[in-house]
Swiss-Prot record:
Cross-referenced InterPro entries: Ribosomal_protein_uL29 (IPR050063), Ribosomal_uL29 (IPR001854), Ribosomal_uL29_CS (IPR018254), Ribosomal_uL29_sf (IPR036049)
PROSITE patterns per the UniProt record, alphabetical: RIBOSOMAL_L29
Protein name: Large ribosomal subunit protein uL29
Keywords: Ribonucleoprotein, Ribosomal protein
Single biological process term from Gene Ontology: translation
GO molecular-function term, one example from the UniProt record: structural constituent of ribosome
Pfam family name, one: Ribosomal_L29
Amino acid sequence: MKASELKNKSMEELTAKAAELSQELFNLRFQLHTGRLENTAKISSVKKDIARIKTILSEKRG
């Protein structure tokens, strides 16, 4: 997900997407600890997407 795509979204959409990605991160971590996760790089990409969204949200609030 690119930052330029995120800048065009509303605050509500960004908040909803952040919540969705947080849930996905929880599920990925659960899969990692139960030994069912094959693509461990997915965790870091989801974390980076969450950080991008939080950055855009703080820019819009500021």
